[in-house]
């Protein structure tokens, strides 16, 4: 057959430009794409040979070979798979998104699909070679055709390609990339092995490269690496997650985890599971023993690697786990996951959602197992990842109850252990109808908060929350197992049956008796406080700040301001202890000129007690100094 010059189909030239300049953000992946295609071709041969063993042509050891020629500036990827006929080369290489494997799978039916280990969803992988090459030569012969019916396909990635017949003894396909000048670094065995190890290590076929050894120089010439004439396998050629779990030791899992996570420690927990059904996939997931430095960066890349049929697709498959589980490392290998044209982003689909739900449930089960059966490991886990786990209350409604059961908090009744909501409920006092908690900037601030005084007096436990995320997260959790959650720093204190009638009566009388001074305090503090009232929640402190139920706490407002966010102004309520000597002194000084200064000192001290800072520290110092003189 004479050489034919044919045109790519309409828009192909434009698409080639897109592929080579815009489609892939990382040029190294061209090798991933071409090795993936080679693996597909071998899988297709294996399937067709089930009915015609002669297609193997006495060569049933399927493999992929990668080699380069520095002098010619070429990189060659060769497989001994199914190969192509002349017509197939024209159809499959002349049309973007014309995938031979896609057409092949379409012809299958029933159980045959389960036996065809094909990727077949990526129509542009071959053209990624033009990222690094200004010319691509393809030589191929389809299994079963005579050597004289080989085909050569050549293109420079413009609007045309040449096709001619060639003599080719071996079955399969060779793709020769004529590298651009700025791609010469791919003529390096070390670099190529690194790319293969990263992207194609778990391809089930062996990937071979020419073996190199150090050769000493002669006649004072420097030594160099030289080819030995042998081939060596440069990938593992076996995906760990595809092996039976009974054949995998904890050491195997640990080494694999270290390889994919670049962590030096073994994982805290591991789950390996094959999911079958409408969506089929394998999950091998790990919980690290230590949190990474960027754990609180919600935009960080996720830790789950996505594979399709053991072919690496991406490092940060964020669609496969919710953001609050971003600490999880591992692999998801899907049999039928749909991907977009460049493989760089997952499409939203039922399959993706099913995998996300399955992986989330599996990780939560891992954490629950630690909590129930390995308390020391769970303690380690919670110290590292408890804060980000709380984010799930606002992100994952479906699993909110499971997450709530996993949360742990410090307590006003113990300094040595953390407690769960279930622990708290089990020791609630008779007549107590709420789970009480307080949020603060630090655990020390929470422990010393004036709002706890009445609860300590009555022996009522209060959960102490000092993570930055606590206030935000608890907006999404109003109750636990039927018992409401109540902040001791919001609304008026109401201990219900736990507060005796004498206390209630005394509080009401104080509000009435103390009304004139309360009104004067309101006027003096009208720019700072929305209200001033007497309270029964204080025992030793003169005053404290609270907000209305439903309002943003002062602690959350401070946190959001520090993060640079716009925060609506919420004036707190100043509650005063009518029995405290300082308040009594204030009452006696109500007609003095210094009253406003004393009122502001009282407010600012209450603000300081909860970890805040006076809006005008200099004015506060000046007022205190004047009081001391």
Curated annotation (Swiss-Prot):
Gene Ontology annotations for the cellular component aspect, listed alphabetically: cytoplasm
Keywords on record: ATP-binding, Chaperone, Cytoplasm, Nucleotide-binding, Stress response
Region (C): 559-629
Positions of the UniProt region annotated as B: 344-558
UniProt-annotated stretches for the region A: 1-343
GO MF term set: ATP binding; ATP hydrolysis activity; ATP-dependent protein folding chaperone; unfolded protein binding
SMART domains, A to Z: HATPase_c
InterPro entries reported for this sequence: HATPase_C_sf, HSP90_C, Hsp90_fam, Hsp90_N, Ribosomal_Su5_D2-typ_SF
Compartments where found: Cytoplasm
Family indicated by similarity: Belongs to the heat shock protein 90 family.
Subunit structure: Homodimer.
Task of the protein: Molecular chaperone. Has ATPase activity.
Stated name of the protein: Chaperone protein HtpG
Species this protein is from: Polaromonas naphthalenivorans (strain CJ2)
Name of the coding gene: htpG
């Amino acid at each position: 057959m004479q050489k034919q010059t044919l045109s790519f189909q309409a828009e192909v030239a434009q698409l080639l430009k897109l592929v080579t300049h815009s489609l892939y953000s990382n040029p190294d992946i061209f090798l991933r794409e071409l090795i993936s295609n080679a693996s597909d071709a071998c899988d297709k041969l294996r399937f067709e040979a089930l009915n015609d063993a002669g297609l193997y042509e006495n060569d049933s050891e399927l493999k992929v070979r990668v080699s380069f020629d520095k002098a010619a500036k070429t990189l060659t990827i060769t497989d001994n798979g199914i190969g192509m006929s002349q017509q197939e080369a024209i159809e499959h290489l002349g049309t973007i998104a014309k995938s031979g494997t896609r057409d092949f799978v379409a012809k299958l039916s029933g159980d045959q699909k389960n036996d065809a280990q094909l990727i077949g969803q990526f129509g542009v992988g071959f053209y990624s070679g033009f990222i690094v090459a200004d010319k691509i030569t393809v030589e191929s012969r389809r299994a079963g055709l005579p050597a004289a019916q080989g085909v050569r396909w050549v293109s420079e990635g413009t609007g045309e390609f040449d096709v001619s017949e060639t003599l080719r003894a071996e079955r399969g396909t060779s793709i020769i990339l004529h590298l651009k000048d700025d791609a010469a670094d791919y003529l390096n065995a070390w670099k190529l092995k690194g790319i293969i190890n990263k992207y194609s290590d778990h391809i089930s076929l062996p990937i071979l490269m020419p073996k190199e050894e150090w050769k000493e120089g002669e006649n004072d010439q420097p030594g160099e690496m030289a080819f030995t004439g042998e081939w060596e396998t440069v990938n593992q050629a076996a995906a760990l997650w595809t092996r039976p779990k009974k054949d995998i030791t904890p050491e195997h899992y640990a080494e694999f985890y270290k390889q994919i996570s670049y962590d030096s420690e073994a994982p805290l927990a591991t789950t390996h599971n094959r999911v079958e059904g409408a969506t089929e996939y394998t999950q091998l997931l790990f919980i690290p023993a230590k949190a990474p430095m960027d754990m609180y960066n919600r935009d960080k890349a996720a830790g789950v690697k996505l594979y399709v049929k053991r072919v690496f697709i991406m490092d940060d498959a964020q669609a496969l786990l919710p953001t609050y589980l971003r600490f999880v490392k591992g692999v998801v290998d899907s049999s039928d996951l749909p991907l977009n044209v460049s493989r760089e982003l997952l499409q939203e689909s039922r399959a993706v959602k099913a995998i996300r739900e399955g992986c989330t449930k599996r990780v939560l089960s891992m954490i629950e197992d630690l909590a129930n059966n390995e308390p020391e490991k769970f303690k380690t886990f919670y110290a590292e990842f408890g804060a980000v786990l709380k984010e799930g209350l606002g992100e994952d409604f479906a699993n909110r109850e499971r997450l709530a059961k996993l949360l742990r908090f410090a307590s006003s009744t113990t300094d040595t252990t953390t407690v769960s909501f279930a622990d708290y409920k089990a020791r609630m006092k008779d007549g107590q109808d709420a789970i009480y908690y307080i949020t603060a900037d630090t655990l020390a601030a929470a422990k010393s908060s004036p709002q706890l005084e009445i609860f300590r007096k009555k022996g009522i436990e209060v959960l102490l929350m000092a993570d930055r995320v606590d206030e935000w997260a608890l907006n999404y959790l109003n109750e636990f197992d039927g018992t409401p959650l109540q902040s001791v720093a919001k609304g008026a204190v109401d201990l219900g049956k736990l507060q005796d009638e004498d206390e209630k009566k005394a509080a009401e009388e104080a509000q009435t008796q103390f009304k004139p001074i309360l009104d004067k305090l309101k006027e003096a503090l009208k720019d700072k406080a929305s209200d001033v009232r007497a309270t029964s929640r204080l025992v030793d402190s003169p005053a404290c700040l609270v907000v209305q139920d439903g309002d943003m706490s002062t602690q959350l407002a401070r946190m959001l301001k520090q993060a640079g966010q716009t925060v609506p102004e919420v004036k707190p309520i100043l509650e005063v202890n009518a029995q405290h000597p300082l308040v009594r002194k204030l009452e006696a000084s109500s007609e003095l000129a210094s009253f406003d200064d004393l009122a502001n000192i009282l407010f600012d001290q209450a603000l300081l007690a909860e970890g805040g800072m006076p809006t005008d520290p200099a004015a506060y110092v000046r007022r205190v100094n004047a009081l001391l003189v």
